[in-house]
């Protein structure tokens, strides 16, 4: 009996140690990604302005280094974030190196904006309201994707055709009736065709604030798509599944938003604009990606927390509690 009791105590100790070092208590560690905190402050005058030059515009997409590179799980990749204010003209970038198939979290400080939104005098400055609402975010990944365009055109077709078996077929089209020489007559028909070209992977801009509904997108989720280790696409989760917004206070460009007044932020820390990164598909070694199961829209299925309130900045929010890693290129 004492032996069984001892085994039970040992199992409890092991469970407790794993829990303390696990995601729920300490937050995701290296195996679940790394938070890049404080890289950029929204509205900060000290961030380099890159103008309207997109990163991928400088890359030769025919170069195989941008199209043929393949990743295994835990390899370092690259993504560049852009934040722009369409009213003030402020623009900045931040680079991040997420590890393949890790659920990664990136935070940008938005304290000043959130404090402004929570001012008691809600309409003190119309231009300031528009300036805050003018913030947009987008992202670039230094790889290309195949984009197929479907279109149609009018083509001339002979009214009379000779088939391979020697038989002659005459079209019943109106243009082929009452013609002088059926052998030279033609009619027009619509021909559908498609063409495939390489285009850079650029996620479209999304707004962060909306004053008409007094809502704010507190987090964005990006899904990377792997095909045998090659990054072939990336998409905003809200664009991937538009039903996500049905349980939110509002939808801003298909992204789930919550009301300003409902934002619960850590005292002295404020709210952070967050980007969650996850992976789908198969890596270079043929392993299926599993980090997709950790995104908020998936997690919502097993949580009592409303999806609109996930990641609002609470101390207990395990999305943030990340351990430092000296070998992480994001800290270099």
UniProtKB/Swiss-Prot annotation:
- The glycosylation sites are 37, 63, 86, 118, 146, 165, 178, 194
Please provide the record's keywords in A-Z order.
Glycoprotein, Secreted, Signal
Q: Which GO terms describe its biological process?
A: sexual reproduction
Give the range the annotation lists for the signal sequence.
1-22
Any one Gene Ontology cellular component term annotated for this protein: extracellular region
Superkingdom classification of source = Eukaryota
Please describe what happens when the gene is knocked out: No effect on growth rate, asexual development, sexual cell fusion, or zygote formation.
Compartments, record wording: Secreted
Identify this protein by name: Uncharacterized protein DDB_G0273449/DDB_G0273577
Origin organism of this chain? Dictyostelium discoideum
Specify the taxonomic lineage: Eukaryota, Amoebozoa, Evosea, Eumycetozoa, Dictyostelia
């Amino acid at each position: 009996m004492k032996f069984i009791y001892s085994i039970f105590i040992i199992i409890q100790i092991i469970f407790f140690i794993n829990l303390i070092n696990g995601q729920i208590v300490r937050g995701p560690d290296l195996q679940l990604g790394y938070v890049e905190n404080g890289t950029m402050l929204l509205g900060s005058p000290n961030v380099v302005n890159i103008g309207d030059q997109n990163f991928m515009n400088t890359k030769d997409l025919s170069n195989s280094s941008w199209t043929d590179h393949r990743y295994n799980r835990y390899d370092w990749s690259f993504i560049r974030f852009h934040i722009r204010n369409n009213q003030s003209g402020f623009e900045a970038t931040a680079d991040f190196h997420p590890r393949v198939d890790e659920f990664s979290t990136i935070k940008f400080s938005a304290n000043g904006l959130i404090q402004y939104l929570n001012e008691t005098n809600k309409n003190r400055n119309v231009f300031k309201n528009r300036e805050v609402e003018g913030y947009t975010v987008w992202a670039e990944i230094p790889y290309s994707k195949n984009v197929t365009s479907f279109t149609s055109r009018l083509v001339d077709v002979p009214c009379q055709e000779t088939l391979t078996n020697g038989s002659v077929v005459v079209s019943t089209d109106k243009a082929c009736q009452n013609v002088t020489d059926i052998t030279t007559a033609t009619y027009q028909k619509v021909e559908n065709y498609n063409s495939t070209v390489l285009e850079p992977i650029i996620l479209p801009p999304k707004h962060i604030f909306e004053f008409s509904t007094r809502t704010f997108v507190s987090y964005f989720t990006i899904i990377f798509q792997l095909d045998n280790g090659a990054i072939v696409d990336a998409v905003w989760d809200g664009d991937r599944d538009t039903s996500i917004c049905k349980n939110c206070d509002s939808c801003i460009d298909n992204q789930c938003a919550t009301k300003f007044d409902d934002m619960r932020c850590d005292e002295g820390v404020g709210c952070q604009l967050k980007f969650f990164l996850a992976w789908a598909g198969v890596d270079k070694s043929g392993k299926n990606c599993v980090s997709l199961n950790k995104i908020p829209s998936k997690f919502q299925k097993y949580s009592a927390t409303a999806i609109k309130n996930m990641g609002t900045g609470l101390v207990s929010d395990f999305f943030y509690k990340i351990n430092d890693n000296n070998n992480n290129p994001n800290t270099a």
